[in-house]
């Protein structure tokens, strides 16, 4: 895991990472030692820019004089966010996932990204992404579907995920469109 430390005025230069996904916005502030100082995760409500702006203003207001060494964007809205906030770097999300996975597990050979609207799998061979698999059936099994179903069943999505992870038997919901998955669950 990544160490978390107090976000103080004397933390030195920081790096800000923004992941603007199809359904959520994630923002992290880390120090020069890659220790987490601040995180934010929220639904983007179809319009990520005001939410990101609000978070950045909050950070600058709470930490005047903060020295920002770099701001990097990734995700579905990478270019939009990069241009809107004049960020230093934009990083394709597959590369961002691979870089993060290697940090925690240098010999990683497979990565799964379950996003809000799609699901991607990356095969890693000889230290590089060798193949990418993308689900081709609308948003089956993705974040927005799972979140909607968790709410419909009266669960917080984190609790719902934990229940699924530790279930005695997996449930076959099919592998097609969420409309068909909805029918499978209701049966």
Segments (PLM) and residue ranges:
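Charged, flexible boundary elements
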Residues: 1-7, 89-95
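Gly/Thr-rich phosphate-binding beta-strand-loop-beta motif of the actin/hexokinase/Hsp70
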Residues: 5-33, 108-125
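Short glycine-rich, Thr/Ser-proximal phosphate-binding strand/loop in the N-terminal lobe
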Residues: 18-58, 136
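N-terminal cofactor/phosphate-binding cores enriched in small/glycine residues
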Residues: 27-29, 35, 52-59, 69-80, ...
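Short acidic, glycine/serine/threonine-rich loops at helix termini
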Residues: 28-31, 80-86, 120-127, 133-135, ...
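Short beta-strand-loop/turn "lid" adjacent to the catalytic site in phosphate-handling enzymes
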Residues: 44, 60-94, 123, 130-131, ...
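Glycine-rich phosphate-binding loop plus the immediately following alpha-helix
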Residues: 44-49, 126-169, 182
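A contiguous, well-structured pocket-lining segment that forms one wall/lid of small-molecule binding clefts
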Residues: 171-187
């Amino acid at each position: 895991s990544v160490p978390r430390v107090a976000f103080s005025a004397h933390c030195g230069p920081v790096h800000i990472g923004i992941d603007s996904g199809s359904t959520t916005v994630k923002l992290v502030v880390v120090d020069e030692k890659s220790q987490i100082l601040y995180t934010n995760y929220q639904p983007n409500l179809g319009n990520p820019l005001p939410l990101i702006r609000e978070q950045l203003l909050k950070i600058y207001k709470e930490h005047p004089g903060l020295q920002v060494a770099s701001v990097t964007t990734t995700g579905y809205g990478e270019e939009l966010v990069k241009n809107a906030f004049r960020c230093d770097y934009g990083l394709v999300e597959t590369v961002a996932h691979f870089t993060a996975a290697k940090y925690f597990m240098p010999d990683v050979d497979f990565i799964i990204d379950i996003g809000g609207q799609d699901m991607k799998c990356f095969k890693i061979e000889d230290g590089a992404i060798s193949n990418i698999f993308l689900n081709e059936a609308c948003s089956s099994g993705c974040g927005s579907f799972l979140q909607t179903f968790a709410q419909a069943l009266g669960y917080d999505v984190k609790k719902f995920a934990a229940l699924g992870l530790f279930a005695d038997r997996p449930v076959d919901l099919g592998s097609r469109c969420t409309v068909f998955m909805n029918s499978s669950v209701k049966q």
